[in-house]
Amino acid sequence: MNGLITDLYQLTMANALFNKGRHERKVVFDRFYRKNPFNGGYTIVAGLEHLQQFVENFRFDEEDIDYLESLHIFYPAFLDYLKDFRFKGNIYAVPEGTVVFPGEPLLRFHGTTTEAMLLETGLSMIMNHESLIATKARRVRTVAPKDALMEFGLRRAQGHSAGLWGARAAMIGGFNGTSNVEAGKQFGIPVLGTMAHSWVMSFDEEIDAFREYVRQYHDNLILLADTYNVLEMGVPHAIQVFKELKEEGRLPGKYGIRIDSGDIAYLSQEATRMFTEAGFPDAIISGSNDLDEYTIQSLKAQGCTVTSWGVGTKIITADGTSALGGVFKMAVKEADGKEVPVMKFSNDVEKMTNPGIKTVYRFYKKDTGKMITDLVCLHDEKAADGGDFTLVTESAKWRRKELKAGTYTVEELLRPVVENGRNLPLPVLPEIIRYADKQMDTLWPEYTRLLNPDLMEINLSDKLQTLKSELIRRELGE
């Protein structure tokens, strides 16, 4: 992984701090975001496997150093320092697949000022991108809870890495497979596919294209039915081929057509009627063509009979929100050998940050398993132990949640993922997918609806609110 995957100002700041002898002072940074993507009610965390690879392999080779030297803005001693640079700090993060909300720390970074500056850009790039894709995928899964969802976006992805890691993120978000062969190999994702119009057009007759495909790929009987005319040619030809297979006793358990154009609601209903009348009521109708959660929800409301969806462009590009606004902010700095809590001040209250080394606790209703809320507190505070507990929202202190003893459970969300520069084991992808599904089950429906969802209020502990108030008063000279 190239050490140049960073912004220039990160390097120039590190260069200047090196010259002042302040480059190895200890710091703690938090990564969080301020607004849910897609005007939704939540975000799904993804990207930790990629993050670990990035951190482990972040270094500067000889060519990198030569290039930086050619810019004539870096001290020679600093460039020598970069030659042996390796991250040796600690990172805590919320597990992949976790449902999260604005304002709470999703990643806590312990390192030196140089480490934080050099790694910030890459860490943010990875987590912002993959969490965005996972969230978009989960929204699609929400409107099609029982259908097959296939990620078809590679050719529309904004680069190779976006296509590769986006496919993995889509799986965390609830998809069943991908057309991306490399993602299948690297991540063990089921690879799926049917045929393209070019296959059908390679034959003089559509039915000959179907017959030849069936002859060579007998177990993959999803025939593309819209090359010419879905209802007058595609479906009748598919029925004829299925009849031939049935007579030969070779009709597989799964068979059907894909529709990639036209009015999918109308065409799917007519195709289902035609298949049923011909004795093939179990024929699968697969749909594709610029689909997203809104289109699929609308098609279903119109009686669409598609049960298998190929979603490409709008999943891999996270259509609707161009980027997740995740930020990476200092919360603690070293001064005179001590850890000093710090915060960002701003005229915009929403951009003020929370100071200190923090962690996040999540509360669930004991009887239903549904989420109650999250609590951000200082890391050395004692967690709720199951007794009576009061939660107070910082922005609305009159709205208090009184939790009675024995009615709730609690878990800490931030877990160690890198320790002293070494990666710690992460769950494998199938485990992450199951965990992500369970996470969604903890959300009340009002947080998952596509339009105007309710927004989870994050609570700050009394101790954290007091620390924040003290720093604000100090800044104001009170």
Residue positions per predicted region:
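Short, positively charged
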Residues: 71-79, 159, 388-397
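Gly/Ser/Thr/Ala-enriched C-terminal appendages of enzymes
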Residues: 1-25, 39-40, 278, 283, ...
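Short coil/turn segments at secondary-structure boundaries
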Residues: 66-67, 135-139, 153, 448-455
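Structural motif
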Residues: 148-151, 190-193, 220-223, 255-256, ...
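Short amphipathic alpha-helical segments
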Residues: 47-50, 132, 428, 432
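Residue-level "edge-of-site" marker
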Residues: 197, 288, 312
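Buried, small/hydrophobic-residue-enriched core segments of structured protein domains
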Residues: 1-28, 35-37, 73, 79-91, ...
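N-terminal, Lys/Arg-enriched amphipathic/low-complexity engagement segments
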Residues: 27-83
